């Protein structure tokens, strides 16, 4: 990646067979941000859960649809946008279950909300939803000369 690259976009079919590829890309993105190995794995888990939810809930297991993953590298944080073109979601209805009420397959939103620093649902596109996930780089945040939202250069 050269110093002018600040964004990576990946478009994949909504087929679970591509989740391994997406996990690899997300893991590498975390490493480029110098996150610890644990944080990289956690971010990867959050994105994997989000992708699974898109496939299952937005696309109703229709594997022919597209998901666009856009990764923005900033000095203070990593931003991951997952855009689907399926059934719109009402963000107010997306709530993690209490651990006492967990049943198989019911922890995705819980993991996403607990791993990521910010989780936002943008329902403004004509079709679908953009899930915006941010993970702050705590080692750079205190000493950053950039304001939140300014992009950094990657080596």
Where is each model-derived feature located?
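Conserved polar catalytic motif of the HATPase_c/GHKL fold
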Residues: 49, 53
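STAS-typified acidic loop motif
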Residues: 9-21
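Conserved beta-strand-loop-beta-strand hairpin that lines the nucleotide-binding pocket
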Residues: 1-9, 54-155
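Structural signature of the histidine kinase catalytic ATP-binding subdomain
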Residues: 14, 35-38, 62
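Charged, alpha-helix-enriched surfaces in structured cytosolic catalytic cores
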Residues: 17, 38, 107-110
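Conserved short strand/loop->alpha-helix "switch" segment adjacent to the catalytic nucleotide/phosphoryl-transfer site
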Residues: 20, 26-48, 101-103
């Amino acid at each position: 990646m050269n110093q002018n690259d600040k964004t990576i976009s990946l478009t994949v079919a909504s087929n679970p067979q591509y989740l391994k590829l997406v996990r690899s890309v997300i893991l590498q993105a975390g490493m480029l941000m110098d996150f610890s190995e644990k944080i990289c794995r956690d971010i990867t888990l959050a994105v994997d859960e989000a992708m699974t939810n898109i496939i299952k809930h937005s696309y109703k297991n229709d594997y022919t649809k597209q998901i666009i993953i856009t990764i923005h590298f900033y000095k203070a944080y990593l931003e991951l946008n997952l855009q689907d073109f399926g059934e719109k979601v009402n963000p107010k209805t997306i709530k993690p279950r209490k651990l006492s009420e967990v049943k198989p397959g019911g922890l995705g939103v819980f993991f996403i909300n607990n791993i990521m620093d910010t989780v936002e649902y943008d329902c403004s596109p004509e079709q679908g939803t953009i899930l915006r996930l941010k993970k702050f780089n705590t080692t750079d945040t205190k000493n950053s000369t950039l304001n939140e939202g300014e992009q950094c250069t990657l080596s």
